Amino acid sequence: MNGERCSNPDCGSLTQMTSKIYWCDECNIPIFDMDCPICTSKGRYIASDIRPVFPEENMLISLILTGDALHYQKSSAWNGNNNYIIDGKKVKLSVSTINKWPIEKVKELKDQYDMNAAKLDYSYFDEYKRAFIAANTDRYNAITEEAVHYVQQYKDRYSIDDMMVSFSGGKDSTVTSHIVNTALGTNKVLHVFGDTTLEFPYTMEYKKRFNRNEESQGVRILTAKNREKNFEELCDVVGPPSRVMRWCCTVFKTGAIQKTIASAFKDKTSILSFQGIRHSESVSRSKYERESDSPKITKQKVASPI
């Protein structure tokens, strides 16, 4: 794990900058130390970022790559650096090729998935998940402690009323919320949820479940939403969003959030927004500072604990 000290003199903690993830062939799981904490075997470098492949996705890639819905069901399946990693071996799957499939082939894949969905089994997934957690507990505790200390150093500079968590309903903002609540010992920090009107139903359902969770009960979530514009109607007028013209974010996200913040914080001259930005998300985000002034929203300081 490479790292550097936080440039903030009030902090000075070790900031995790990049990850090196290894594979333990003995335990058949990803590990963050070269020596496996469980079996002490030497790991081999596999990726710089990793995420689990859940059984539903596992079944899909099994169908796409082999035609057998259960082919990888008992395997340790992960995704890192845009590669699937099955039992420690990188497996290529071209998303661009799949995007070019005729609709009939996509429907056929969906039919095959639906026919086999009842066979989904979480037991193997859960087994590898438990092993992964056991092997990487020390690292988890270390980065959690560092992130908590990072948030705590803002207590002398901002009051709770001057802070907010930018909450998207995704895993990164959920972790950020947990870190902030833990570090400050309160769930009184305002959360702002940007409803772009294009959110997945699962995201909206998770937002409801988040508030029912014991830890986050009582967290106040304000929803920022542009209720005056319609996405499809604007597409007819100016064309769909593209890399050249990204009007969607400005109209349906940034603009709505800025209005909500202006209303919620009113006469505040400086507010602190905790955001779930990670360096490993993309090349552009790998260049972000951990603390910066928001380029899009005025009088907002952005801090990224994770």
Outline where the language-model segments fall.
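ATP-dependent adenylation/nucleotidyltransferase module used to activate substrates
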Residues: 2-34, 38-45, 49, 55-67, ...
